Amino acid sequence: GETDVNAHNIEQIEAKCKGKTTIRFITMGDSQRWYDETEDFVKEVNKRDDIDFVIHGGDMSDFGLTKEFLWQRDIMNGLKVPYVVLIGNHDCLGTGAETYQAVFGPTNFSFIAGNVKFVCLNTNALEYDYSEPIPNFGFMEQELTDRADEFEKTVVSMHAHPFADVFNDNVAKPFQYYITQYPGLQFCTAAHNHGFDDRILFDDDVHYIVSDCMKSRSYLVFTITPEKYEYE
């Protein structure tokens, strides 16, 4: 089956959105166990012709089993539009992180759609010892300047937002400091909570917008225009 899924799809996203000043994308996540609902999601999205790409906010798997990732990948590959998948805390269980990296790629990555950079981060600190920095500030810092002339706005996506149970709250403030350094920060997206939420977690007007799980048959559609952003 296909490996390096994110890299292949990012090529398509970047090519498709090149030169656009308005982009429209979907966030969803936590599809673990809910295969039928995820198949229905794919059918729903395929009925639309206004979506540029989809961000899966993580937790494709329940137990980090290889077959779970492959089943979900095969379902998501049914989408007419390109998609990327973030790593969720359940995806880190057992050998899940290795499988995720083989099938989808690095756990921290970024891409540019139109004039918006999407910085996608592994925030599941609880599932790791200190062998790997979660969140990876070195990566976040590098993304501030990498391809700087190609984007004017930024969206930061993660599975678990600060103060969620698997986030390392010890670094919540430095994490937020790094995020607010990004040019034209629009908002942050997250999943994990199995419920919709839009909240400001710090004293700074940065919205964390959380998509519900697939069990609820729910997803969010974001539009970023030259003037503003909105979602439904």
PLM features: residue spans?
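Short, histidine-centered active-site or binding-site loop motifs used for metal coordination
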Residues: 57-58, 122-125, 160
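Short, solvent-exposed loop/turn segments at secondary-structure junctions
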Residues: 164-166
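Short active-site segment of divalent metal-dependent hydrolases/proteases
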Residues: 33, 61-62, 91, 162, ...
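Extended active-site neighborhood of metal-dependent phosphoesterases/phosphodiesterases
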Residues: 4, 9, 66-153, 171-187, ...
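Hydrophobic beta-strand anchors of alpha/beta hydrolase catalytic cores
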Residues: 25, 54, 118, 154-155
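N-terminal active-site segment of His-dependent metallophosphoesterases
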Residues: 1-71
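Active-site glycine-centered loops adjacent to acidic/histidine catalytic or metal-binding residues
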Residues: 30, 58-59, 88-89, 159, ...
